[in-house]
Amino acid sequence: LAQSIRTIIEHDQARDKTTQTLANALKNRGKVQGDWGEQVLTNILHDSGLREGEEYFVQDNIKDEEGKNLRPDVIVKGADGTRIIIDSKVSLTAYSDYVGAEDDEQRKAAIKANHESIWKHVEELAKKNYAKLVDNAVPIVLMFVPNEGSYILAMNHDASLGSKAY
């Protein structure tokens, strides 16, 4: 019995370490967060019955006015030929700080940082002008936030965030 308990404890500790490693990877590496967000987005499109390469295109290369290569995460092809551009943006670090906050001061700071992170993504996305660079694109770009908690936290902090982004 003692050996079984030790084994259970060892497995539990190994699981905790793996979970912490994954959380740290997502929290501290922008590229990992971005890849995760893109994967969530493409999974949703696929699970909705859309076919990659036919109804949506991942990381299509487009050029801006200066010839610089840009790659929106997804371009969805509408039935009428219009294009809907979707770019995934992840704000996980500040949200994780909010969830782990131990007092109101830490929570308030994390709420503000989360809002600022999302707003920074909005501004960066707006500067890319994807909608002007893709033929038949609708005049707006959708920003997909795969972490619903982060999105809700930002909207609760500033309900006008969506209209400001538009």
What are these language model-derived features?
Residues 1-166:
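Amphipathic, heptad-repeat alpha-helical coiled-coil/stalk segments that mediate oligomerization
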